Amino acid sequence: MEALHKKIREEGIVLSDQVLKVDAFLNHQIDPALMKLIGDEFAALFKDSGITKIVTIEASGIAPAIMTGLNLGVPVIFARKQQSLTLTENLLSATVYSFTKKTESTVAISPRHLTSSDRVLVIDDFLANGKASQALISIIKQAGATVAGLGIVIEKSFQGGRAELDAQGYRVESLARVKSLAGGVVTFIE
């Protein structure tokens, strides 16, 4: 997606050979016009997949997930990282390790919102080692729902997440596939 590539080149900051900072437009400050384009693109890619729900993890996946849900006309569910007083019933949950935060947390969704009749699209901001995606897939499977595909805003292709998801037979659509961050330069797989 050229608009996303341009934004990454202009506003993304390479912190290391492993870390790309995109807080100027995606995971701290959000560019609504770019999120609309991202939602349009994911909706076009998955329009014939019978999606009934979108699932993401709070917080950075919420903006692209909402725009995709708006386009597809389906609800968006975000897995919560912190349990609240209102989220108390037998939760669907999984443990996820954050590559950038170097922490492990439990994410959860209420079973009231995800059922065995759902065809679910996972939307996330990044795909690196695939831990967040695998956690969401686990939650979807606990509900007996079907994973219809995964929409990733930025994929770090040099890490193993994509290969693992491909090996499991999941459809993965990434809008920006980063080949390398070596030397402080973002190189894309075109």
From Swiss-Prot:
Record keywords, A-Z: Cytoplasm, Glycosyltransferase, Purine salvage, Transferase
Subcellular localization, as worded in the UniProt entry: Cytoplasm
InterPro entries hit by this protein: PRibTrfase_dom, PRTase-like, Pur/Pyrimidine_PRTase, Xanthine_PRibTrfase
GO biological process: purine ribonucleoside salvage; xanthine metabolic process; XMP salvage
Keyword Glycosyltransferase: yes
GO cellular component: a single term: cytoplasm
Pathway involvement of the protein, from the record: Purine metabolism; XMP biosynthesis via salvage pathway; XMP from xanthine: step 1/1
EC number: 2.4.2.22
Source superkingdom: Bacteria
Chain segments annotated as transmembrane: none
Record carries keyword Transferase: yes
UniProt GO molecular function: xanthine phosphoribosyltransferase activity
UniProt cross-references to Gene3D superfamilies, sorted A to Z: 3.40.50.2020
Catalytically driven reaction(s): XMP + diphosphate = xanthine + 5-phospho-alpha-D-ribose 1-diphosphate
Residues annotated for 5-phospho-alpha-D-ribose 1-diphosphate binding in this entry: 128-132
PANTHER family the record matches: HYPOXANTHINE/GUANINE PHOSPHORIBOSYLTRANSFERASE, XANTHINE PHOSPHORIBOSYLTRANSFERASE
Binding partners and assembly: Homodimer.
Family: Belongs to the purine/pyrimidine phosphoribosyltransferase family. Xpt subfamily.
Protein function: Converts the preformed base xanthine, a product of nucleic acid breakdown, to xanthosine 5'-monophosphate (XMP), so it can be reused for RNA or DNA synthesis.
Protein's UniProt name: Xanthine phosphoribosyltransferase
